[in-house]
């Protein structure tokens, strides 16, 4: 099984139309390469709120994803599953609820949970088994998924969320 991570400079809810267009092009290129390689997941970070309220950013992201699907269809790309990833900075779109909303709104979308990012956004709240089970319950209650793609590492965080990833040995 192959899982791919798309470029980090994707922003589905940018205030700049040119950045949205570039983001679409990056996702299309990722989907094309993923189809060639038989990737089962195409992981990406949804983007930054860009000083918008999260609800408005979500609305723009959904419109951008609709554009993405139109362009993928026009390109003849049919074999893909995008996997938006939870993000670590509080200025980024991508808390657990937002990832669930994106995935529940579109076919071919399944979540990626980066536990370090969730921990950083929550300013260090993943400390025991029950904390992790809470996330699993949210996913199970809202999405019909058979396979969950996750990342796990240690992370440095501050008031704004993620500062820096560290290796497990650090």
What are these regions (language model features)?
Residues 1-2, 9, 16-21, 116-118:
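Terminal, non-globular segments
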Residues 2-6, 39-46, 152:
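Short beta-strand segments at enzyme active-site cores
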Residues 3-14, 159-165:
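N-terminal small/glycine-rich loop or linker at the start of catalytic domains
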Residues 8-11, 48-51, 118-120, 157-159:
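Conserved radical SAM core fold
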Residues 12-112:
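Active-site acidic/histidine proton-transfer and metal-coordination neighborhood
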Residues 67-167:
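Acidic/histidine-rich catalytic cores of soluble enzymes
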